[in-house]
UniProtKB/Swiss-Prot annotation:
Its main location: cytoplasm. Keywords: Aminoacyl-tRNA synthetase, ATP-binding, Cytoplasm, Ligase, Metal-binding, Nucleotide-binding, Protein biosynthesis, RNA-binding, tRNA-binding, Zinc. This is Alanine--tRNA ligase. GO terms for biological process: alanyl-tRNA aminoacylation; negative regulation of DNA-templated transcription. Zn(2+) binds at H552, H556, C656, H660. Consists of three domains; the N-terminal catalytic domain, the editing domain and the C-terminal C-Ala domain. The editing domain removes incorrectly charged amino acids, while the C-Ala domain, along with tRNA(Ala), serves as a bridge to cooperatively bring together the editing and aminoacylation centers thus stimulating deacylation of misacylated tRNAs. Its EC number is 6.1.1.7. The gene is alaS. It comes from Alcanivorax borkumensis (strain ATCC 700651 / DSM 11573 / NCIMB 13689 / SK2). It comes from the Bacteria. GO terms for molecular function: alanine-tRNA ligase activity; aminoacyl-tRNA deacylase activity; ATP binding; tRNA binding; zinc ion binding. One of its GO terms (cellular component) is cytosol.
Length: 863
């Protein structure tokens, strides 16, 4: 049975049993920053199992695409070297949300395996948890499974979502490949060998684990099952390795053709075939190669595949060409793969071209390090150098080491990385900035959402990194209050500035930072003194704060607009929100076009004109996700989060602790000022709002008015007029070039009279007025043809620069080299140059010395 037929048979069987067919979810988990990639069929139903979400069905079935290549579930290093490890796989599953339980789940599984697929019962082995008498009775007494092919196991047969929450026993079904294959049954010492292969896991969620470890029965027990498509396909197709099934054969052949490898058993081909699946589907689902988070895992996968291609002798881009074979194999099951084929190929090719430039050099460094190795462990500093200089992820280096029976010093690598991070922190800090080193016990309440001025108490003072009781006039330091309206730098938003005032004392705040639970006001005591326990009025710079708020709110609107215009793959990669402008880095593989920029601006300004209220709501993190609020992967959120909503019809909803305008109309105006690359796969937009946006538009209008006046046109017709003038300039430049060539041709004829005979050799060394380098080269070719046999040097002067061309006809190159002659002349005019024996060019910076340099050519030939 083909894999596609197997996938369809599974879904059809469970649909016939009252299950709703649910499409595979994205490999990027929706609103779940705790999960790197979708790695199981139940991921998209997690909130249903937890009771946080309800759906209009209680039975579901799916074929879920999954990736395991990072974090807790990481199969990357084993891929290609074992029969069943993959970075990408499909998980067939059936699910019950408080509907059926153990009896039906077991019956469905047994009926599908032995009935629909026709697997012999004597080839199947079943396990249950040691405590699960109910499941054991169903298998042994109702399904008729032989006690000789049945076992009770402990922790291997108990599943839990986390330290607390839903959990329960599981039942696993194994396929026995026969006595001629090494290995023992589940639970034996040899269970990890290849004879008995797990093909299906049935999880019975019947308990809720409490913080104290107690297992309380769930009111609605549920079922979550998973069967790897590739594994069961291998069983049905009579092969022991997943790489031998039909899904991989076309990919292996395409990889072999692309790399020139003829051995389809080659492990590197298996790596490439596996990795084109995971890389393509990840890009399809919006992940872009980068140096952080999901993008970094994708980059590691791609670079590992490229390294194996290089190992097979392929040093040109090849990986992106395999996408077509993948689409042909899986495009029918996943139509989105075909729709995104061009984008996937483009992203892979860009990564190949970028890494290809350093792969060969990095491999030379690694090979050299291995040759010089004294022992069997590759040092951590070698791994660090390869990563830092050549972009080699450490697991790629470990992959090479593994092939040579070497191990790697990962602890040494981590130590080198930590040292680099420490150096970076030191380099990025001001000499007198001690705030990073402070350990502050105080807790500051933030009142800045409601107030821009507040009366507070000083609870801590610091000078030169040390706690003090008093700050006096003229001293720089840091002040901690019990409560403050000053926003501390966080989430890309800059810290507030302003003043702390008490009677005659004034402390000017130049920055506000968060250290532990305290807000640290950084600045200078300009008059009077502050003491611990003293009262102050904390006054935020209102105009600056309002400008920051406009830019922060505009950032949210722009983020939503980017996802609307460019696609759901857009994810925030970094941001800066200041009073003057906003900067936003996001995942996207190509430049944003002018038309797209305009559409983004229109969408944002439309929301500004709508002048809708900006609302914030405090809720727990799970409720926020359920409400559709965007969460950033890798961010750590408190149990209670602020959900910020703005724009009409739910235009933008994100988790955010920053300060924002009350209504979108308060932003005033939005204008993009820059769009550029920030890193591979990451674009950057800078924009301004309010009066800054108006100032930008006024400057642009003034510039346009000046251009229109220069070309004698109205503003509306200025662009057409400039295009017309530019075309005329191009035509005139062509005419000038034509006249130069004509001049050179005429000059070439005139110059023959200057030829001198030096020891039987025709020699010409002269300056041509008004010529450039190209004219000199054309003239040289004409003179060589005309003279037949000669040594020639031509020069031209433009300003303070000298252009030189030397030529020697073919018959004289054994004795005279144009490169040597050019170097001889160029050095005399403070320049340099070089070239072939028959033609060389260069220049200099001393026109005054040119006559003497040309005169010396005759002596050079005569030597």
């Amino acid at each position: 049975m083909k894999s596609a037929e197997l996938r369809q048979a599974f879904l059809d069987y469970f649909a016939s049993q009252g299950h709703t067919k649910v499409s595979s979810s994205s490999l990027v988990p929706a609103n779940d920053p705790t999960l790197l990639f979708t790695n199981a069929g139940m991921n998209q139903f997690k909130d249903v199992f937890l009771g946080r979400e309800s759906r209009d069905y209680t039975r579901a079935t799916s074929s879920q695409r999954c990736v395991r290549a990072g974090g807790k579930h990481n199969d990357l290093e084993n891929v290609g070297y074992t029969a069943r490890h993959h970075t990408f796989f499909e998980m067939l599953g059936n699910f019950s949300f408080g509907d059926y339980f153990k009896r039906e789940a077991i019956k469905f599984a047994w009926e599908f395996l032995t009935g629909t697929l026709g697997l012999p019962e004597e080839r199947l082995w079943v396990t249950v948890h040691v405590s699960d008498d109910e499941a054991a009775d169903i298998w042994l007494k109702e399904m008729g499974v032989s006690a000789e092919r049945f076992s009770r196991l402990d922790e291997d047969n108990f599943w839990q979502m986390g330290d607390t929450g839903p959990c329960g026993p599981s039942s696993e079904i194994f396929y026995d490949h026969g006595a001629d294959v090494p290995g023992g049954p589940p639970g034996s010492a040899d269970e990890d060998l290849d004879r008995y292969i797990e093909i299906w896991n049935l999880v019975f969620m019947q308990y809720d684990r409490q913080p104290d470890g107690e297992l309380q029965p769930l009111p609605k027990p549920s079922v979550d099952t998973g069967m790897g498509l590739e594994r069961i396909a291998a069983v049905l197709q009579g092969v022991h390795s997943n790489y031998e099934i039909d899904l991989f054969q076309a990919l292996l052949q395409a990889a072999a053709k692309a790399t020139g490898c003829t051995d389809l058993e080659e492990k590197s081909l298996r790596v490439i075939a596996d990795h084109i699946r995971s890389a393509s589907f990840l890009i399809c689902d919006g992940v872009i190669p980068s140096n952080e988070g999901r993008g970094y895992v994708l980059r590691r996968i791609i670079r590992r595949a490229l390294r194996h291609g290089h190992k097979l002798g392929q040093d040109k881009p090849f990986f992106s060409t395999l996408v077509a074979a993948l689409v042909a194999e899986m495009g029918e099951a996943y139509p989105e793969l075909g729709r995104e084929q061009a984008r996937i190929e483009k992203a892979l090719l860009a990564e190949e071209e970028q890494f290809g430039r350093t792969l060969a050099a990095g491999m030379k460094v690694l090979e050299s390090a291995i040759e010089q190795l004294d022992g069997r462990v590759l040092p951590g500093d070698v791994l660090f150098n390869l990563y830092d200089t050549h972009g080699f992820p450490p697991d790629l280096t470990a992959d090479v080491a593994r092939e040579r029976d070497l191990s790697v010093d990962m602890d040494g690598f981590e130590a080198a990385m930590a040292a680099q991070r420490e150096r970076a922190r030191g380099a990025g800090s001001f000499a007198n900035d001690y705030s990073d080193r402070l350990n502050i016990d105080a807790i500051t309440d933030f009142s800045g959402y409601e107030k821009l001025a507040d009366d507070n108490t000083v609870v801590a003072l610091y000078k030169d990194g040390a706690a003090v009781d008093t700050l006096n006039a003229g001293e720089e330091g840091m002040v901690v209050l019990d409560r403050t309206p000053f926003y501390a730098e966080s989430g890309g938003q800059v810290g507030d500035t302003g003043a702390l005032i008490a009677d005659e004392a004034r402390f000017m705040v130049t920055d506000t930072r968060k250290r532990q639970a305290a807000h640290v006001h950084v600045g200078k005591q300009v008059s009077g003194s502050l003491t611990i326990g003293g009262k102050v009025s904390a006054c935020v710079d209102v105009d600056r704060r309002l400008a920051v708020m406009r830019n922060h709110s505009a950032t949210h609107l722009m983020h939503a607009a980017l996802r609307n215009v460019l696609g759901e793959h857009v994810q925030q990669k970094g941001s800066l929100v200041s009073a003057d402008y906003l900067r936003f880095d996001f995942s996207h593989g190509e430049a944003v076009s002018e038309a797209q920029r305009e559409e983004i601006e229109i969408l944002v300004n439309r929301q500004i004109l709508a002048n809708t209220a900006v609302t914030t709501e405090l809720m727990d993190i799970e409720s926020a996700r359920e409400a559709g609020a965007m969460a950033l992967f890798g961010e750590k959120y408190d149990d209670q989060v602020r959900v910020l909503s703005m724009g009409s019809d739910g235009f933008s909803k994100e988790l955010c602790g920053g300060t924002h305008v009350n209504r979108t109309g308060d932003i005033g105006l939005f204008r993009i000022t820059l769009e550029a690359s920030a890193a591979a796969g990451v674009r950057r937009i800078e924009a301004v709002t309010g009066e800054h946006a108006l100032a930008v538009m006024r400057r642009q209008e003034r510039a346009l008015s000046e251009i229109a006046a220069t070309v004698k046109s109205s503003l509306d017709n200025a662009a057409d007029r400039v295009r017309s003038q530019a075309q005329k300039v191009r035509e005139l430049e062509k005419e000038i070039e034509r006249l130069k060539q004509k001049l050179a041709s005429g000059a070439g004829g005139d110059l023959t009279s200057e030829v001198q005979d030096i020891n039987g050799v025709k020699v010409l060394a002269t300056q041509i007025d008004g010529a450039d380098g190209k004219t000199l080269r054309v003239t040289m070719d004409k003179l060589k043809d005309k003279l037949g046999s000669a040594v020639i040097v031509l020069a031209a002067v433009e300003g303070e620069k000298v252009a030189l061309v030397a030529g020697v006809t073919k018959d004289l190159t054994t004795k005279y080299k144009a490169g040597d002659l050019l170097k001889f002349v160029a050095e005399q005019v403070d320049g340099r140059g070089g070239g072939r024996p028959d033609m060389a060019q260069g220049g200099g910076n001393n026109p005054a010395a040119l006559p003497g340099a040309l005169e010396s050519v005759k002596a050079w030939v005569a030597e």
